[in-house]
């Protein structure tokens, strides 16, 4: 018999510690009717059965309410309900359109898009799959009974099957064919029997999703992310199917639990990306405080990806013989978008150009000083994290910036530059490039002095882009460990830009690090698209050759580095998720995400000669 003694129930809770098991929090969108925000019990019961903690999300189209809600959930369940107003998809209403739910539309479309930005696992059910599609570039058929029944291969079938059953909600009434190799096929095999209560369906999934199941008459019954994200949408109602529906909820809870683990890990460790080229976009007037689609790094994306710090490089393209440096860069574009620079000459030296980039970065930081800071040392990075600020460090990509003047090494050290990539795509006065003509047969006499001066000033020597001979020369010349801020494995992708296994071993033997990059041409030599799994493969090969203490991540974002599954800074937590799936420990993930690099940085900076 049920007890009504509150103390008895509390005693059961207080009898052991912890009082409850940790569970991922699953936000569930509520329906809205006549002033009531409500939810059918089947949704939250299935979430609870799967091991999640369900919370109901009311349909409030307020950015503060939505974003703060998303910050506190680990997974999102978008529920069924009325039609979505077709105006949200840029369409006029069909005569067959049923009732809409305007209160839900804006709130849920915003929630879905913002959850996607934050990599939150999602399950969409019925209206929910349509919400995901509309929010992320897909299309919904306003009335499937008015459309010709066509299979995915273009074959027209004789008639539409019944998609709005009269049978009990718990009764499956038609089959769905599930595509092999999908997440759904791992849950249900190649065929499942489902219930059906809809007159609309996803017509086009959009570029971020693949169809994973169809009905016998060709209706899209399920879709899932093709970006290695934990997102599935189904047209049927698994919440009513008891044990048969439970696998989808278990999948959501498992993925939410994994995401919670990754979020908590990012709270505890420092994450540092050692190379991006976002300053290349300054001539286009990009804003770091806006979520700008033109760049892969900004404050929004860093926050969404729960990422702490990045080394932004002042990239200097290497002029060919007869070219002037000022012809290679859009100085006029930077001036155009920065009125305070009006009157500045467009005929800048490489040193002046690098200084201009760092001036602009300092301006960005000054304008957003509550949220971001310039860091010069590992201690600065940890202090910024403690104060909940993002960090930018300065790097130089191409020693051309020194303008053949050793005094500029100290100048850039004083500006806070933490590394200089000795060359880029072409030989310079310091060393030969892997895309050069062996002008010096390795490091030049001047280059040897540059390396020694960098050692004296506590600047890391970066050998990404250097020729193999330059690499070994620099390794012999430098008194401090060498880094490769964004370099991959030649054993997996045989291009001169990548490191051989012998180079990796030599680098590790001298205490250096090589950071895996996301540039597709250094991940795969064939024409197929590079993905986050290729990045993991290159990282793991580097670990096999050098050991866990000599690897890291240098994305090359905004320098053409991007892959499906980790396309910009908002998706960097997805890389952590992949490491967790590969069973890397927290300690090893911390090393990969910058711990190894910071060890080398500390050693290099501590070796600085006192003047």
Predicted regions and their residues:
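Redox-cofactor binding/interface segments in oxidoreductases and associated redox assembly factors
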Residues: 28, 77-78, 312, 422, ...
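N-terminal hydrophobic targeting/anchoring segments and the immediately downstream early-domain regions
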Residues: 261-439, 494-553, 557-611
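Divalent metal-binding pocket/active-site signature
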Residues: 400-403, 411-497
């Amino acid at each position: 018999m049920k007890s009504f003694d509150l103390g008895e129930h509390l005693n059961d809770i207080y009898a052991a510690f912890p009082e409850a098991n940790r569970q991922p929090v699953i936000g569930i969108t509520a329906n809205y009717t006549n002033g009531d925000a409500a939810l059918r019990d089947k949704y939250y019961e299935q979430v609870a059965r799967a091991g999640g903690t369900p919370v109901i999300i009311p349909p409030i189209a307020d950015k503060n309410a939505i974003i703060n809600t998303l910050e506190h959930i680990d997974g999102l369940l978008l529920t069924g309900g009325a039609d979505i107003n077709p105006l949200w998809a840029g369409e006029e209403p069909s005569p067959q359109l049923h009732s809409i739910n305007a209160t839900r539309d804006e709130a849920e479309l915003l929630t879905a898009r913002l959850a996607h930005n934050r990599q939150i696992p999602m399950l969409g059910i019925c209206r929910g799959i349509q919400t995901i599609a509309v929010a992320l570039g897909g299309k919904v058929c306003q009335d499937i009974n008015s459309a010709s029944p066509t299979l995915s291969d273009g074959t027209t079938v004789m008639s539409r099957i019944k998609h709005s059953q009269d049978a009990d909600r718990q009764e499956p009434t038609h089959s769905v064919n599930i595509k092999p190799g999908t997440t759904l096929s791992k849950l249900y095999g190649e065929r499942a029997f489902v219930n059906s209560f809809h007159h609309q369906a996803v017509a086009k999934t959009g570029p971020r999703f693949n169809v994973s199941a169809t009905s016998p008459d060709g209706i899209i019954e399920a879709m899932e992310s093709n970006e290695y994200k934990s997102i599935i949408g189904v047209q049927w109602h698994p919440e009513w199917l008891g044990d048969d529906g439970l696998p989808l909820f278990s999948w959501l809870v498992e993925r939410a639990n994994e995401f919670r683990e990754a979020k908590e890990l990012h709270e505890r460790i420092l994450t540092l990306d050692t190379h991006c080229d976002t300053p290349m976009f300054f001539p286009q007037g990009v804003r770091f405080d806006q979520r700008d689609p033109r760049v892969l790094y900004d404050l929004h994306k860093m926050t969404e990806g729960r990422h702490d710090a990045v080394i932004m490089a002042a990239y200097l393209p290497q002029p060919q013989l007869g070219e002037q440096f000022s012809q290679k860069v859009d100085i006029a574009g930077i001036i155009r978008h920065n009125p305070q620079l009006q009157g500045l000459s467009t005929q800048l030296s490489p040193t002046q150009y690098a200084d201009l980039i760092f001036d602009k970065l300092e301006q960005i930081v000054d304008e957003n000083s509550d949220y971001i800071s310039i860091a010069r040392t590992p201690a600065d990075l940890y202090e910024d994290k403690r104060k909940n600020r993002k960090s930018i460090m300065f790097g130089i990509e191409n020693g051309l910036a020194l303008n053949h003047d050793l005094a500029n090494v100290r100048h850039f050290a004083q500006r806070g530059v933490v590394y200089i990539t000795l060359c880029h795509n072409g030989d310079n006065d310091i060393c030969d490039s892997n895309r050069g003509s062996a002008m010096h047969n390795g490091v030049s006499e001047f280059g040897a002095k540059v390396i020694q001066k960098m050692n004296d000033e506590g600047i890391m020597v970066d050998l990404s882009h250097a020729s193999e001979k330059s690499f070994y020369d620099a390794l012999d010349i430098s008194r401090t460990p060498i880094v490769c801020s964004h370099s991959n494995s030649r054993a997996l992708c045989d291009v001169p830009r990548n490191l051989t296994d012998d180079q990796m071993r030599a680098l590790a033997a001298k205490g250096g690090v090589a950071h895996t990059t996301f540039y597709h041409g250094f991940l795969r030599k064939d024409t197929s698209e590079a993905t986050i799994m290729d990045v993991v493969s290159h990282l793991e090969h580097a670990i096999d050759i050098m050991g866990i203490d000599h690897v890291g991540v240098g994305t090359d974002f905004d320098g053409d580095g991007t892959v499906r599954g980790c396309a910009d800074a908002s998706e960097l937590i997805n890389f952590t998720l992949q490491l967790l799936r590969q069973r890397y420990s927290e300690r090893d993930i911390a090393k990969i995400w910058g711990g190894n690099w910071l060890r080398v940085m500390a050693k290099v900076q501590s070796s600085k000669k006192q003047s």
